[in-house]
Amino acid sequence: MRTREGRRGLLFICILAVVLLALLLLSFGLGRYAVPPAEVIRILLSRIFPVTPSWTEQMETAVISIRLPRILLACMVGGCLSAAGTAYQSVFRNPMAAPDILGASSGACFGAALAILLGFSRSGVTALAFVSSLLSVALVYAIAWRAKGNPVTMLLLAGVMIGSLFSACTSYVKLVADPTNQLPAITYWLMGSLSGTRMNAVGFAAVPMLIGLVPLLALRWRINLLTLDEEEARSMGVNTGRLRLVVILCATVLTAACVAVSGMIGWVGLVIPHLSRKLVGSNCRYLLPASTIFGAIFLLLVDNISRNLLATEIPIGILTAFVGAPFFLYLMTRKEQML
């Protein structure tokens, strides 16, 4: 029999899922070339079932070729960043932990900047950003493993160090980049954007995202134990070191995949887990799926604003910062905050 918290958690997860489906339908119709919801449904169904066309070729191109990849990627990136943030906050028992806490984002930024400097294609930029992100976290873990002291503290300190190192490397790449073509491309990538997304980018991101997300969801019952005291968790028969490693690896793969395909989109992994916690509580059994769905809703909503608010598209990383910075201030002013 489910507890009151469990029933509340399931209720909010169902509500969030319905909201996401409604927002998905709305998002397909939004844009410079508006498409009615009824036509959106018919166009999407036509990819599976035989449907008599009642739409124009321009409508189909807008929905399938332009908006579908971008909408899918927005949901994937938003959901995975939120899941990674939730996992990191549980592992480090720190409400201020975010997906970039171990230097994954800084590593991806350096890889992307270097790839642009070397003249790589868009796929090459994505691939090098992903590899560089994983490399940065591998360095963090290697340093923390050799250091003496509390493993969680050593990971945090190593993450700060490696993140600063890769940020410095990115700054140097920007310094030597061609100011006419390469520097603007690097700067725009660092601001984060889903512009020009194609299905190959969605396919590239889907594999590591599934590799990272599925184990996290399967382990969400055990992740709760990482919030306990180290000795208390071990007394319950949990190998905290191994569990922490698995959770960090999964969250790192998620972060690396997200940053590699979308650039720097900050605050999602910090803000959404906190808002989800307000809805369903701190039990990861409900918090992790709720945070994942809520993250998809949030980033899809922000992306809709990004591409429709002005004639010129606003980089999505700027808009998420407008939301995240005030929320960070709110967290700082709370009496019960944990730093």
Model-derived features: where do they sit?
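Alpha-helical transmembrane segments in inner-membrane proteins
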Residues: M1-L339
